[in-house]
């Protein structure tokens, strides 16, 4: 654990130096191909960083924050697009916006920033109890185990982002973008993926994939068809990115299952939008919000098994649980040593 932690710190220092290079050098180069060429070596470096770890948590953090977030933002920055445009005023803000899904506040007020400690504590308690439940997984049905796996991933991400949110606010006065907006209240797939679940992803995929694909498609087809192709392209890229993230976690050749999951949802979302645009539906067919929520959430839950199969099959979920317990023991041990003065 200690060696992995030291390696984690070293690589984050390297990442900060690399992003600083992009801030000072790339800003002196006009937006376009030449700026892109100047940041591509950094993007390549960020693709390699997760491979230096054997712990799933460290590899996953590197893959998520650098290989995925930072790389997409730097590529958009090369063309004066995305969250790094206009250029942040300070290097520290540039680094944080590059690595994390943050939303800078112009006039942050610490009195308005209240971390719900009680909610955080409840999530931590549930998460710890859930970790202990893995010892009894042989007694759980596959359906219940899938629910446990989904809850485990959700809670772990929530806890990590809450900690990062507090750290970023303390250092910069910036607030993190909310990771979700009550996804269980989604009334359609378009609502779920575009406005409720993992909100930072559509915020990046829109300028990086959807808009360019739609503009190119407009040359050959009408505006509605171009919009559908743009949506489908965004889901395709999202699937490819998740395949990459799963590769870093499992170190196994991608099977394409995750990509097919996103392609399925892309096709269904496009079909849903097309149906809602039809005259008959707009005039005569009204579905109550309760029914639409049940249908939407039910479809997402049923198909989510496809998304989790690679992680379950490779034992990554169990490794995440064991590493989390090991981390808790490590912190407890260090805390006791600190108290005893040894």
From Swiss-Prot:
Its main location: membrane. Its EC number is 2.3.1.75. It catalyses: a long chain fatty alcohol + a fatty acyl-CoA = a wax ester + CoA. InterPro entries: Wax_synthase, Wax_synthase_dom, Wax_synthase_Magnoliopsida. GO terms for biological process: lipid metabolic process. The keyword Transport does not apply. It is found in: Membrane. Signal peptide: none annotated. GO terms for cellular component: membrane. Keywords: Acyltransferase, Lipid biosynthesis, Lipid metabolism, Membrane, Transferase, Transmembrane, Transmembrane helix. GO terms for molecular function: long-chain-alcohol O-fatty-acyltransferase activity. The chain crosses the membrane at residues 9-29, 36-56, 58-78, 115-135, 153-173, 227-247, 255-275, 297-317. Belongs to the wax synthase family. Catalyzes the final step in the synthesis of long-chain linear esters (waxes). This is Probable long-chain-alcohol O-fatty-acyltransferase 3. It comes from Arabidopsis thaliana. The lineage of its organism: Eukaryota, Viridiplantae, Streptophyta, Embryophyta, Tracheophyta.
């Amino acid at each position: 654990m200690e060696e992995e932690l030291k390696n984690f710190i070293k690589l984050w220092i390297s990442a900060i130096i690399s992003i600083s290079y992009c801030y000072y050098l790339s800003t002196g180069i006009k937006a376009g191909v030449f700026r892109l060429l100047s940041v591509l070596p950094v993007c390549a470096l960020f693709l390699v960083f997760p491979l230096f770890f054997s712990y799933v948590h460290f590899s996953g953090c590197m893959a998520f924050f650098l290989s995925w977030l930072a790389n997409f933002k730097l590529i958009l920055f090369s063309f004066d697009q995305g969250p790094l445009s206009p250029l942040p005023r300070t290097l520290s803000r540039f680094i944080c916006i590059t690595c994390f899904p943050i939303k800078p506040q112009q006039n942050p007020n610490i009195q308005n920033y209240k971390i719900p400690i009680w909610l955080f504590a409840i999530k931590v308690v549930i998460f710890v109890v859930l970790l202990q439940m893995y010892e009894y997984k042989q007694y759980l049905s596959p359906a219940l185990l899938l629910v446990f796996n989904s809850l485990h991933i959700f809670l772990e991400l929530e806890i990590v982002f809450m900690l990062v949110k507090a750290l970023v606010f303390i250092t910069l006065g910036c607030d993190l973008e909310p990771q979700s907006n009550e996804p269980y209240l989604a009334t359609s797939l378009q609502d779920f993926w575009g406005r409720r679940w993992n909100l930072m992803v559509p915020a990046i995929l829109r300028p990086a994939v959807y808009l360019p694909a739609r503009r190119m498609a407009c040359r050959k087809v009408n505006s509605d068809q171009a919009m559908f192709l743009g949506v489908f392209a965004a889901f395709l890229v999202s699937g490819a990115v998740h395949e990459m993230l799963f590769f870093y976690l499992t170190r196994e050749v991608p099977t394409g299952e995750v990509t097919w999951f996103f392609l399925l949802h892309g096709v269904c979302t496009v079909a849903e939008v097309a149906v809602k645009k039809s005259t008959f539906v707009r005039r005569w067919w009204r579905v109550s919000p309760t029914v639409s929520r049940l249908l939407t959430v039910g479809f997402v839950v049923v198909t989510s098994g496809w998304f989790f199969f690679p992680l379950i099959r490779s034992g990554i979920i169990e490794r995440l649980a064991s590493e989390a317990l090991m981390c808790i023991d490590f912190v407890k041990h260090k805390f006791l040593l600190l108290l005893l003065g040894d």
